[in-house]
Design a protein with these regions (language model features):
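N-terminal non-catalytic cap/leader segment that marks the start of a structured domain
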Residues: 1-56, 157-160, 168
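Catalytic-pocket segment enriched in acidic/His residues
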Residues: 6, 10-19, 42, 75, ...
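Flexible glycine-rich active-site/ligand-binding loops centered on an Asp-His dyad
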Residues: 53, 57-61, 104-144
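Short, conserved beta-strand element in jelly-roll/cupin
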Residues: 58, 85, 90-96
């Protein structure tokens, strides 16, 4: 649309892009549910095989939520020796999705977003202070600020084939 950018820039009270502070898409979600060890190669990283049947899973607490460019606070525990970050595709559910037929899975999705999921990996794998255990998955993912969520919400109609998306993290 011709002239669109100029019209947008002339809106009174418009905040300049460089002054915009992005926040997480949602501050108090009912549930944050994560799937873990779903990549065979990553499961090997922590000395496990990828689960068969149901995937490994964990919950995130609301105090883990931060927006992009917010600081990630590293745990100050002596057991916490290696914090890692993984870029993930976040799937935002718009309704309860229990007992949804497999062929209708997309009907429960409102959209997708980017996530940076932090893990205190040394506790999960084990170190001089604590033996490793995959049951620690929820603990090692729930330190405050360990879940950067958003800021964009991409609706399903904007993604021709979600299974063809690639997600990667790049350290700046």
């Amino acid at each position: 649309n011709e002239g669109g950018k100029e019209e947008l820039e002339s809106i009174p009270g418009l905040v300049p892009t460089e002054e915009v502070v992005y926040a997480p898409l949602y501050r108090n979600p009912k549930r944050i549910f994560g799937i873990g060890l779903n990549y065979a190669d990553h499961a090997k990283d922590i000395g496990n095989a990828a689960p068969t049947g149901f995937p490994g899973s964990f919950f995130k607490m609301a105090d883990t939520l931060i927006g992009p460019n917010d600081d990630i606070l590293l745990p100050k525990l002596k057991e916490a020796q290696k914090t890692t970050a993984e870029a993930e595709l976040g799937i935002i559910m718009g309704r309860d999705c229990r007992d949804v037929p497999e062929e209708e899975w997309e009907s429960a999705i409102v959209g997708y977003t980017t996530i940076l999921d932090m893990t205190e990996e040394s506790i999960l794998k084990g170190n001089d202070f604590v033996p490793g255990n995959p049951r620690y998955l929820t603990i090692v993912k729930n330190f405050p600020t360990f879940f950067s969520f958003g800021p964009q919400l991409v609706t399903p109609d904007e993604v021709p084939d979600v299974l063809k998306l690639e997600v990667q993290s790049v350290h700046n």
